[in-house]
Amino acid sequence: MKIHEYQAKEILRRHKANVPFGVVIDKKENASKAHDEVTSKTGGSVVVVKAQIHAGGRGKGGGVKVTKTKEDAIAAVDKILGMQLITPQTGPEGKKVLKVYLEQGIDIAKEYYLSILLDRSIRKTIIMASTEGGMEIEEVAETHPEKILKIAIDPGIGLQVNQARQLAFELGLPAESHKSFQSLLAAIYEAYIKEDASLLEINPLILTKQNEIIAGDCKIDLDENALYRHADNAAFRDITEEDPLEVQASEFNLNYVKLDGNIGCMVNGAGLAMATMDIVKLAGAEPANFLDVGGGANKTTVTNGFKIILGDPNVKGIFVNIFGGIVRCDMVAEGIIEAAKAVDLKVPLVVRLQGTNSELGREVLNKSGLKITGVDDLREAASTIAKLIG
């Protein structure tokens, strides 16, 4: 689950990490009060106004402004709050800014990159760091891979002091900042483990002119499967930042991810769903979604799946690919017919049924009188739907 920067920093504060003081607001009339609270608390005059959306690259899109006066801060809030912010991660449609974070300005000497995540190839948590702070880490990996440092953490013993010290030396941090760096690294590692995060990223990690190490920006992704252990973190969910179709799908207990193509895919099983998307692309078309209706697919599930798929105006055709194991293909076929009638289906529909009662399922579809194209071969089915949408 993605959360906002101000929420991520709230988590870091729980674990005594050094983060700037800030105030979040969702109304422009609260800008003056928020500015005063930040400056009176910190004693400084510089306030950074940051758009709060679930996407990176906010600064490049005009969503981050450094202000030196109260008037400038109010003007920045007025401009950013409510804007449609477009960044490299939002897509061309952008995201509407519904909250802004007014934060204490920091006297920056140098910026670094720091993150904690799971490396599945070695089955361990790793710490990644770089001297190239403030940049997209993917860009650094492509242009200067030698500037990315990695340390693997033994899950049995956790982060060790010597590892933190080693990383400080390899980053070239001044000796006066090592204690501050080790303290922050220990705090964010504790946060990553205890809060069940799947990613914790600080970019930039700031070295101040006073040799303090501070988390300038923070991104945390939380493991949704562990939220039952963290009621306070579950409350951080902001559905206004999520795709409405994905929210609706979660209410139906469907695994749905919206994509940019025009062929809606309905499949049972995540592996088959991935293979279906691949075969659609090989046929020269683009999948509009990932949709796994699960092993217990029934009439209601299929109808809800159709509603989700057709909620995307880009969908020009639907490819249903079902392998009957636990689920019976004839029951799925009945669900497809019922769903097609319920949603008044007007786009081409190709159905591939294999497995338990697949022949009976095909017979049910053939007798329905609906314009449904049944195909047995996977590659042929993908080619058929690609041709039908032109």
UniProtKB/Swiss-Prot annotation:
Keywords: ATP-binding, Ligase, Magnesium, Metal-binding, Nucleotide-binding, Tricarboxylic acid cycle
EC number: 6.2.1.5
Residues binding substrate: 268, 325-327
Catalysed reaction equations from the record: succinate + ATP + CoA = succinyl-CoA + ADP + phosphate; GTP + succinate + CoA = succinyl-CoA + GDP + phosphate
Coiled coil: none
Binding-site positions, Mg(2+): 203, 217
GO MF assignments: ATP binding; magnesium ion binding; succinate-CoA ligase (ADP-forming) activity; succinate-CoA ligase (GDP-forming) activity
Cofactor: Mg(2+)
Cofactor binding mode and count: Binds 1 Mg(2+) ion per subunit.
One of the protein's GO biological processes: succinyl-CoA metabolic process
EC class: ligase
Binding site for ATP: 50, 57-59, 103, 106, 111
NCBIfam families, alphabetized: PRK00696.1 (NF001913), sucCoAbeta (TIGR01016)
Record text on subunit structure and interactions: Heterotetramer of two alpha and two beta subunits.
Identification of the protein by name: Succinate--CoA ligase [ADP-forming] subunit beta
Organism whose genome encodes this protein: Leptospira interrogans serogroup Icterohaemorrhagiae serovar Lai (strain 56601)
